[in-house]
UniProtKB/Swiss-Prot annotation:
Keyword annotations from UniProtKB, A to Z: Riboflavin biosynthesis, Transferase
Binding site for (2S)-2-hydroxy-3-oxobutyl phosphate: G87, T88, R129
Active site: H90
One of the record's GO molecular function terms: 6,7-dimethyl-8-ribityllumazine synthase activity
Top-level taxonomy: Bacteria, Pseudomonadati, Pseudomonadota, Gammaproteobacteria, Cellvibrionales
Organism of derivation: Saccharophagus degradans (strain 2-40 / ATCC 43961 / DSM 17024)
BP term (GO), one: riboflavin biosynthetic process
UniProt-listed Enzyme Commission number(s): 2.5.1.78
Gene3D superfamilies: Lumazine/riboflavin synthase
The protein, known as: 6,7-dimethyl-8-ribityllumazine synthase
Top EC class for this record: transferase
Family, as annotated: Belongs to the DMRL synthase family.
Oligomeric and partner information: Forms an icosahedral capsid composed of 60 subunits, arranged as a dodecamer of pentamers.
UniProt-listed Pfam families: DMRL_synthase
Pathway(s) it belongs to: Cofactor biosynthesis; riboflavin biosynthesis; riboflavin from 2-hydroxy-3-oxobutyl phosphate and 5-amino-6-(D-ribitylamino)uracil: step 1/2
Length: 155
C-alpha cells in the first residue's frame, strides 16, 4: 500500500490575491510589497488578479482582513507590514494582536492569510528582511500564498 501525499506547488497561475499593506514604516514595507508582486508575477499571476489594499498599520490588519475575506473575491490575502520594537510595550501589543487576529480570520474564513509582517528589534533588522541580507519576506509570503492556494485546492 502506498501512502498518499498531498502538497501544494507554485503553479497557481490563476486566482486573485489581496496584498494588505501597512502604511507605517513604509520605507521598509514598500520593499516587501514590491517583492510580493514580483513573486506573484513570476509565477504567472496577472496584474488584474493582484490588488493592493493599504491599512494604517498592522494593528488594523485583522479587521481589514476580515472585510476582505467576507468579500469572497480573493483566493489568499498576503499581509505585509513592519512592527519595530521601541522602548515601550506597544510593540508587544501590536505584534501579538496582529498575529492572533490574522490567524483567527484565516481559520474562520477558511482562507489562506500569509504573514509577511516583520516583527523586529531594530530598523536594521527590518531593512535586512525587506530585500537585503536576509532576503525579502514579502516575496516569501507571496510564495507561501501560492503554495497554500494550490494545497487547499487539492485537499
Amino acid at each position: 500500500m502506498t501512502i498518499k501525499v498531498i502538497e501544494g506547488d507554485f503553479k497557481a497561475s490563476t486566482g486573485k490575491y489581496a496584498l494588505l499593506v501597512s502604511r507605517w514604516n513604509s520605507f521598509v514595507v514598500e520593499h516587501l510589497k514590491d517583492g510580493a508582486i514580483d513573486t506573484l508575477r513570476r509565477h504567472g499571476i496577472s496584474d488584474e488578479n493582484i490588488e493592493v489594499i493599504y491599512a494604517p498599520g498592522a494593528f488594523e490588519f485583522p479587521l481589514a482582513a476580515q472585510k476582505l475575506a467576507d468579500a469572497k473575491r480573493y483566493d489568499a490575502i498576503i499581509a505585509l507590514g513592519a512592527v519595530i520594537r521601541g522602548g515601550t510595550p506597544h510593540f508587544d501589543y501590536v505584534a501579538g494582536e496582529c498575529t492572533k487576529g490574522l490567524a483567527q480570520v484565516s481559520l474562520n474564513a477558511g482562507l489562506p492569510i500569509t504573514f509577511g509582517v516583520l516583527t523586529v528589534d531594530s530598523i536594521e533588522q527590518a531593512i535586512e528582511r525587506s530585500g537585503t541580507k536576509a532576503g525579502n519576506k514579502g516575496a516569501e509570503a507571496a510564495s507561501t500564498a501560492l503554495e497554500m492556494v494550490s494545497l487547499i485546492s487539492k485537499i
